[in-house]
């Protein structure tokens, strides 16, 4: 069999592609609607079809929202939709660059890329910028390692970074580089008055008062009925320098007796049923 010439092979290949293409292309048929989002299937003379999409949709089957519907391109940039992918890019006007055309060409964010260690540069004005640093870095240009990550401040204190150094702001009652040391307030005399004893606590202290005195610093005389210790309308009566008794309302006494009687009867009933 004689060998086929290259030109004939190309012609046969092209003919095959023409016949085979409709089998793989979009088909508009009765009872079959390939287009979504109210797209309309339109048939070519060759028998193949395409989806005519309504405003706001694109893609082979109108399956994508138009990414240019909300144009994010700044400074006069033009939004260019990639229909098959449902994505968009910005074609920037002269003098601007960036994914959204947000940078002027000579802006530091674009020219010198000042934000280090993966930081993101944000343009504040034509000549100024601000860096948003990745976790673990700090500084105007994210040039410092965040020392607070490796130096934890203790006892609820707050860590701040200055350059590549850390500083702990301690809560009252603690001291030390990392606020790890409890301040013993009892080392300073005079906290507790009238012979009260100072008891050191973590981050604080407490005064244990002598009989006859009360208050945070044992600075007030103890009056038994001063703080109205009796509840449910009872009346406090001082019986001594440091003692008192409560005179309860009759209804309160009766309720207590009834509750006690009820508990006793319930106990007897329970014993009878055993």
Curated annotation (Swiss-Prot):
Entry annotated with the keyword Methyltransferase: no
Signal sequence, renumbered to the chain: 1-25
UniProt keyword list: Calcium, Disulfide bond, EGF-like domain, Repeat, Signal
S-S bridge residues: 28-41, 35-51, 53-62, 68-79, 73-90, 92-101, 109-121, 115-131, 133-142, 148-159, 153-168, 170-179, 186-198, 192-207, 209-218, 225-236, 230-246
Keyword Cell inner membrane: no
Pfam families referenced in this protein's UniProt entry, alphabetically: EGF, EGF_CA, hEGF
Superkingdom per UniProt: Eukaryota
Expression (tissue specificity): Lower expressed during corticogenesis.
Residue span(s) of domain EGF-like: 26-63, 64-102, 105-143, 144-180, 182-219, 221-258
GO MF: calcium ion binding
Matching InterPro entries: EGF-like_Ca-bd_dom, EGF-like_CS, EGF-like_dom, EGF-type_Asp/Asn_hydroxyl_site, EGF_Ca-bd_CS, NOTCH1_EGF-like
Similarity comment: Belongs to the NOTCH family.
Protein name: Notch homolog 2 N-terminal-like protein R
Species name: Homo sapiens (Human)
Gene: NOTCH2NLR
């Amino acid at each position: 069999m004689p060998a086929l010439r290259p030109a004939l092979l190309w012609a046969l290949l092209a003919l095959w592609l023409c016949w085979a293409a409709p089998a793989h292309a979009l088909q508009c048929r009765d009872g079959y609607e390939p287009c979504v989002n109210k797209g309309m299937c339109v048939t070519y003379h060759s028998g193949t079809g395409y989806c005519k999409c309504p405003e706001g949709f694109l893609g082979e089957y109108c399956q994508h929202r138009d990414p240019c519907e909300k144009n994010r391109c700044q400074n006069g940039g033009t939004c260019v939709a990639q229909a098959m992918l449902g994505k968009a890019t910005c074609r920037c006007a002269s003098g601007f660059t960036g994914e959204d055309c947000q940078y002027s060409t000579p802006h530091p964010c674009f020219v010198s890329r000042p934000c280090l260690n993966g930081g993101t540069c944000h343009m504040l004005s034509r000549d100024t910028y601000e860096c948003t640093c990745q976790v673990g870095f700090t500084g105007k240009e994210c040039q410092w390692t965040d020392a607070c990550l490796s130096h934890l401040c203790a006892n609820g204190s707050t860590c701040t970074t200055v350059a590549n150094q850390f500083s702990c702001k301690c809560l009252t009652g603690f001291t030390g580089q990392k606020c790890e040391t409890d301040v013993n307030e009892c080392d300073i005399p005079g906290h507790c008055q009238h012979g009260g004893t100072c008891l050191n606590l973590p981050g604080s202290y407490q005064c244990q008062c002598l009989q006859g005195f009360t208050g945070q610093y044992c600075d007030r005389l103890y009056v038994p009925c001063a703080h109205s210790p009796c509840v449910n309308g009872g009346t406090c009566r001082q019986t001594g320098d440091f003692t008192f008794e409560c005179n309860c309302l009759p209804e309160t006494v009766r309720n207590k007796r009834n509750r006690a009687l009820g508990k006793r009867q319930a106990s007897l009933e329970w014993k009878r049923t055993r």
